[in-house]
């Protein structure tokens, strides 16, 4: 599958897996980002969220996807199932240790004054997330209009240039990989396992 002006590049994954970090890399690499910048940077995402509000209503409204052609948009994994087969997609799917995801979400909630559900609930949520990810991976494999590259959050932090080259190869070898790698700040990696 080649990337062209009609291809929609999607950054996906669970929340708190590095999707905003990947959007930042792709923007630095030269891609056009589809974002409205309504949700601004904060303590939880110091470099911004790169979200597009219309994504939240993807289930009921896909008309905005025409504006995404030739661009990159962030869509959480739960919403991928609502992407119509009438477009071609290149999906950069972010992966991260589930316990780190949960720890990051807990910290985000605490900063907003909401208590964590606790360790027992974290194990249950981890099982739900693992099941969702397995089902999503299986679903993506069956979609001829979608090609997916899986990128590990920790691998990006450990070797940003190597991962930037993988992403560039997947997206057609037209990105500035050095600039992509230069935007990675390992100091923002706060929830480790």
Protein language model annotation of sequence segments:
Residues 72-175:
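PAPS-dependent sulfotransferase catalytic domain
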């Amino acid at each position: 599958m080649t990337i062209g002006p009609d291809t929609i590049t999607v950054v996906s994954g669970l929340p708190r897996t590095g999707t905003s970090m990947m959007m930042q890399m792709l923007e630095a690499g030269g891609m056009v980002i589809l974002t409205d910048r309504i949700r601004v940077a904060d303590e939880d995402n110091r470099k911004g969220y790169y979200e597009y509000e219309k994504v939240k209503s993807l289930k009921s409204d896909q008309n905005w996807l025409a504006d995404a052609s030739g661009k990159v948009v962030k869509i959480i994994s739960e919403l991928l199932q609502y992407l119509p087969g009438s477009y071609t997609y290149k999906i950069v799917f972010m992966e991260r240790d589930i316990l780190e995801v949960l720890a990051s979400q807990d910290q985000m909630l605490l900063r907003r004054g909401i208590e964590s559900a606790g360790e027992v609930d974290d194990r249950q949520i981890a099982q739900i997330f693992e099941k969702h990810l397995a089902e999503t991976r299986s679903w993506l494999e069956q979609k001829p209009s979608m090609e997916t590259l899986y990128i590990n959050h920790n691998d990006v932090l450990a070797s940003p240039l190597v991962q930037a080259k993988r992403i560039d190869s997947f997206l057609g070898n037209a990105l500035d990989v050095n600039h992509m790698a230069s935007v990675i700040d390992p100091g923002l990696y706060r929830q480790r396992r």
